[in-house]
Amino acid sequence: MLTHKTCQARKKMQVSFVIRDAEEKQHRNGVNALQLDANNGKLYSAGRDAIIRVWNTRTDSSEKYIQSMEHHNDWVNDIVLCCNGRNLISASCDTTVKVWNAQKGFCMSTLRTHRDYVQALAYAKDREQVASAGLDKAIFLWDVNTLTALTASNNTVTTSSLTGSKDSIYSLAMNPSGTVIVSGSTENILRIWDPRTCMRSMKLRGHTENVRCLVVSPDGNQVVSGSSDGTIKVWNLGQQRCVQTIHVHKEGVWSLLMSENFQYIVSGSRDRNIIVTEMRNPSNKTLVCEEQAPVLSLGYNIDKTGVWATTWNSDIRCWKLPMYDRCTMNSSGGMDAQWTQGGTEVACIKGGAAIKECAVLNDKRYIITKDSQDQVVVYDVLRVVKKEQLGAVDYEAEVKKRNKQVYIPNWFTVDLKTGMPTIVLGQEEVDCFSAWVSIEAGLPECVDPTTEIKINYGKLLLEALLEYWTPPHSIPPNEMEPDMHGNGYFQVPKHTPVIFSEVGGRTVCRLLVRDAAGDSESTLLHETAPQWVTDVVIEKNIPKFLKIPFFLQPHPQMTKPERTKKDRLVANEFIQCRKVCEHVLEKVLNAETTPSGGNANNSLQNSQSDANSEGSQLPAEERIELWCNDVVVDPNMDLRTVRHFIWKQSTDLTFQYKTKQNFNYDGSIGDSLERVTRKY
């Protein structure tokens, strides 16, 4: 027996998992941020598929993948390299900031200070200080050396906060010496703080929409901002005003890079264009390239002759930057540069396809998806695997073809935000224990023809996901009883990520199926797993059956109009209509369901006995016909399927029964029917 910690104030929890390959070498969605370690040529990319990947940009090979860094479970919005490339800090929509060993690729610690999506990070290299900000309007300052020293026992960290923001923060920047920090938000203004004192020094107005990207000059005197209003603005902090507005894009500016001398701007936009502009002379500009989708992030290559770009798509491309042949002084005192040809794609890190559409089949075990490359795939939710790759076929036609006329309650939801199928189990709008099915229908590959077992999809799946969890402080099993782990029918892939999170909120715990056996993971599960999970996984409790009330009455052909009184019955919703036929035959009509025996006294009695014996050997569904809404019901249908597809009303389901034409009752049976009808 396990004593599980309970708390009345604990928030409602859900469990989710991702159906994926053991190693996902390609991004499966857009890439939000880039960081290059120029010392070794490693490029770090933060994906909307919740994975940070590391690439070798020094190789000419198409295989640039080095490793994946996995511990987030939602979009990774920003990353910064620190400590000379030894560590990496990441910010995510899962509301966490994580500290990584950049060389070995593992998560060292998780910071849960933010209460909403963490959108942006800023880094002061000279002070080894990082700032984080997000949709909770909060900005926190972190000492990197303290973060990288955190351990399981030394896990307390203090942070300074910068207050005053009145709306969601989408951009953040610091200068290397850490004397200035700037934030941009949906207030459409820039707020400036001194991170040394945590005091706000000014706010700057001028943009008319969200401020999406920021760069601070090394001396802390200038700020360049890009906004959803399509403009780039240059701000002088000493004068506390905008000194220049640059119009080179037709849509929002989402990413900015500055040259080392802070004279040239490389900008990426929602209009898909990447443009180089001279800051003092904005008319001196050139188009680097037009990407295939809105540009999310930019980063220089090692020698700064090119720029890496990411978009809504999963590819990462490096484009050659135009060079300057010669410069001449123009009438305004600026330099007119003669641009060489740029825009050549010099490298490409290919991404994978993101799932864009999903249909849950009526059997509530399989889903069919369509991705950004029009590939259609069938997934087995129960076994957590890809079942069938159908190729570029007609998606709607496949869904229609594979949908059976069966109704099973929804017991999971599907989230496609990361580009991979994430299955969510909970107890709120969709009850993960609502799907009871016969083992013959739900697991035909495990059928024992001698049994009529009913299985619960949600229970089986949770038992498989947490098969390796052995709770701490649990009483050892009786030696005479087997130590039951898993569900006894199947296992799920051991690499499957399992996430425990608050409903509509923060992530509490993430682990792989195979890691649940670890001491720390087991303890964490004990502390965070909701009671409804431990009830079925640890306590082995059986989820309750859902019942359906229904009426049963003779068909008009079976009795006189005044003898149509209805019986009101209640049964488990998953029982098949053949069971209702048996009830009618045995309890209502009082007919024999086994061959009758005994001696006959004359030839008439013998013939009647033979006829009854022959008829009683037939299954009930071959002797009784059920009708609903003037439709003959398939005896293999269950009650919930009849209610959903045939009855289609909010009132109680109603059946009418009658005997089949090839099976006739004698007068005595008719008398029995009349008596039973009166009785009921």
From Swiss-Prot:
- Any one Pfam family match given in the protein's UniProt record, by short name: DUF3337
* Matching InterPro entries: G-protein_beta_WD-40_rep, WD40/YVTN_repeat-like_dom_sf, WD40_repeat_CS, WD40_repeat_dom_sf, WD40_rpt, WDR48, WDR48/Bun107
Give residue ranges of the WD repeats. Answer: 26-65, 71-110, 113-152, 164-203, 206-245, 248-287, 290-329, 350-389
Q: What does this protein do?
A: Regulatory component of the Usp12-46 deubiquitylase complex. activates deubiquitination by increasing the catalytic turnover without increasing the affinity of deubiquitinating enzymes for the substrate. The complex deubiquitylates the wg/wingless-signaling receptor arr/arrow, which stabilizes the receptor and increases its concentration at the cell surface; this enhances the sensitivity of cells to wg/wingless-signal stimulation.
Q: Which PANTHER family match?
A: WD REPEAT-CONTAINING PROTEIN 48
To which protein family does this belong? Answer: Belongs to the WD repeat WDR48 family.
Q: How does it assemble?
A: Catalytic component of the Usp12-46 deubiquitylase complex consisting of Usp12-46, Wdr20 and Uaf1; regulatory subunit that, together wtih Wdr20, stabilizes Usp12-46. The Usp12-46 deubiquitylase complex associates with arr/arrow; the interaction leads to deubiquitination and stabilization of arr/arrow.
- Repeat as a keyword of this entry, yes or no, is yes
Among the GO molecular function terms of this UniProt record, one is: ubiquitin binding
Q: Which terms are listed as keywords in the entry?
A: Repeat, Ubl conjugation pathway, WD repeat
UniProt GO BP = double-strand break repair via homologous recombination
Disulfide-linked positions = none
Chain's gene name: Uaf1
- Give the matching CDD domains: Ubl_WDR48, WD40
What name has this protein been given in UniProt? WD repeat-containing protein 48 homolog
